[in-house]
């Protein structure tokens, strides 16, 4: 299983977050750098994958409410795609 631990320090703004996610999650070149596109890409993952999300992502002042929305998208995608696991630590 591929395990990816997200680094909150790399998520300094919404554009930086999407750039980081594109790299960290090896998202396709057509990734649209928004939460809808992220959901689409995550539900298409075919390799067993675990994403470890820092627990304080929802309290991050640089991301604001977007951190909460990101976590929700990750969790929703994991519900849809049985080989994707999202763990909050």
Give, region by region, the residue ranges found by the protein language model.
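Positively charged, polar, low-complexity stretches
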Residues: 1-89
């Amino acid at each position: 299983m591929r395990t990816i631990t997200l680094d909150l320090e790399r998520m300094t703004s919404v554009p930086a977050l999407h750039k980081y996610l594109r790299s960290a999650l090896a998202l396709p070149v057509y990734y649209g750098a928004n939460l809808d596109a992220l959901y689409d890409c995550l539900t298409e993952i075919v390799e067993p994958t675990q994403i470890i999300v820092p627990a304080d992502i929802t309290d991050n002042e640089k991301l604001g409410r977007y951190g909460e929305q990101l976590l929700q998208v990750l969790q929703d995608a994991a519900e849809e795609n049985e080989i994707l696991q999202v763990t909050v630590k």
